[in-house]
Design a protein with these regions (language model features):
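SH3/SH3-like beta-barrel fold
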Residues: 60-62, 91
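Helix-rich interaction surfaces within compact, conserved domain-sized segments
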Residues: 73-115
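N-terminal leader/targeting segments and the immediate start of mature chains
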Residues: 2-24
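Short solvent-exposed strand/turn elements
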Residues: 62-73
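Mixed-charge (acidic/basic) macromolecular-recognition segments
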Residues: 2, 11, 30, 113-115
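A short, Trp-centered hydrophobic/proline-enriched beta-strand micro-motif
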Residues: 24-33
Length: 115
């Protein structure tokens, strides 16, 4: 059974910086869902380089081999944990578009700690 966890905005940078090394080379797909576009897979099982959040530009940068996918002004981030680890990251941007990064194999992360 999977578990969802909303990541508070003040933790975004630390959360993604902490997992970026573990993401290197992991295969991911990105699906974008909006009322205007419907559901579209924009990257299919491409090796990842990492994910970073830039507070100054309010930008989530998903680095993949062959190019980056940038989400400007993210409003909400929810991660899904499967029994074997983190399986997806769902991001809703300021316009209400949902973008989901799914990992082909769950990512085992150390337990989250709040500071």
């Amino acid at each position: 059974m999977s578990q969802l966890r909303a990541v508070p905005k003040q933790e975004w940078r630390r959360f993604f910086d902490g997992m970026s090394k573990e993401l290197l080379g992991k295969r991911a797909e990105i699906e974008v869902s909006s009322l205007d576009l419907g559901d579209q897979i924009i990257s299919e099982w491409v090796p990842m380089i990492g994910i970073t959040y830039d507070h100054g530009d309010d930008l989530l940068d998903i680095a993949l081999e062959g190019g980056n996918h940038m989400i400007r002004h993210p409003r909400e981030i929810v991660v899904e944990y499967a029994p074997m680890g983190l399986s997806s990251v769902a991001v809703v941007d300021a316009e209400g578009t949902q973008q989901v990064v799914r990992l082909k194999e769950p990512l085992v992360l150390p337990p989250a700690t709040s500071k």
